């Protein structure tokens, strides 16, 4: 994913930073960077959530562009924090926002059984405050699940105004899971409050494969052009006002 983004930058004038928990994946990523001539990429190995390595003077580094395809609904994402946790009223160990020294979860703590918004909040904390933008691949549940996730989603839309677009993807697009996913696009310092919704999961917007569906180059180009145009397209795209989203309880 980082290499794909790297190749989209004219002249390759970009610095690459990344972190992955699995040691084998880290080794493959590092080798892949080297084989593609990216010798100065800084790829760290470790838990991105409980032990982020992108630090400067004990603060999270910030970036103009952040992209990720984190594991869907990661269970026990908070396990790296719990050594410092206290028992709650029911005698259970529970993650709390104050356990994170980087204040990434001040908007709300995602449920232990679903780490999707933990990654979103981490990525947002690493965004440049002036012109940062990010895209993250997530399961559809992030769009409607309630409780703490609903509170976080509302803060992101109502108070921070950082959600720029939601791109629905076809089912069976990724290895290891057949569930449909979406891409959430976030931007800092947005001048509007509406959100663009693109439904790229419909018939004709992808190629059906025997074992896996595929987004063809023409399908990807259609998504990109629609995102930049930011206009409604019949049965494909819709620009929802903040009031509409609010009336739908931020789902």
Per-region residue spans from a language model:
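Short alpha-helix immediately C-terminal to the canonical SAM-binding loop
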Residues: 2, 24-28
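Conserved SAM-binding loop of SAM-dependent methyltransferases across substrates and taxa
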Residues: 1-11
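A conserved structural/catalytic subdomain of Rossmann-like adenosyl-cofactor enzymes
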Residues: 57-251
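Short acidic capping loops at alpha-helix termini that bridge into adjacent secondary structure
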Residues: 12-14, 40-42, 194
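Conserved SAM-binding motif I beta-strand of class I
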Residues: 15-20
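S-adenosyl-L-methionine
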Residues: 27-60
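Short, surface-exposed basic-aromatic patches at helix termini and helix-loop junctions that form
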Residues: 8-10, 35, 154-160
């Amino acid at each position: 994913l980082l290499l794909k983004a790297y190749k989209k930058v004219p002249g390759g004038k970009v610095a690459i930073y990344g972190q992955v928990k699995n040691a084998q994946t880290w080794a493959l990523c590092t080798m892949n960077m080297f084989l593609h001539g990216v010798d100065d990429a800084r790829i760290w190995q470790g838990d991105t959530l409980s032990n982020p390595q992108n630090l400067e003077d004990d603060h999270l580094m910030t970036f103009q562009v952040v992209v990720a395809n984190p594991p869907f609904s990661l269970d026990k994402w908070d396990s790296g924090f719990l050594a410092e946790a206290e028992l709650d009223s029911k005698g259970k160990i529970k993650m709390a926002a104050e356990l994170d020294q980087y204040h990434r979860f001040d908007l709300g703590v995602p449920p232990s059984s679903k780490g999707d918004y933990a990654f979103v909040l981490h990525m947002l904390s690493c965004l440049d405050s002036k012109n940062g933008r990010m895209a993250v691949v997530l399961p559809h549940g992030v769009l409607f699940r309630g409780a703490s996730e609903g509170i976080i989603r509302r803060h992101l839309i109502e108070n921070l105004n950082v959600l720029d677009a939601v791109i629905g993807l076809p089912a069976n697009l990724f290895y290891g899971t057949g569930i449909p996913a979406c891409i959430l696009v976030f931007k800092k310092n947005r001048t509007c409050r509406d959100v663009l919704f693109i439904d790229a999961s419909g018939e004709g917007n992808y190629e059906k494969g025997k074992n896996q569906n595929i987004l063809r180059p023409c399908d990807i180009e259609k998504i990109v052009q629609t995102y930049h145009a930011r206009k409604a397209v019949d049965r494909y795209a819709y620009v929802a006002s903040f009031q509409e989203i609010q009336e739908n309880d931020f789902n």
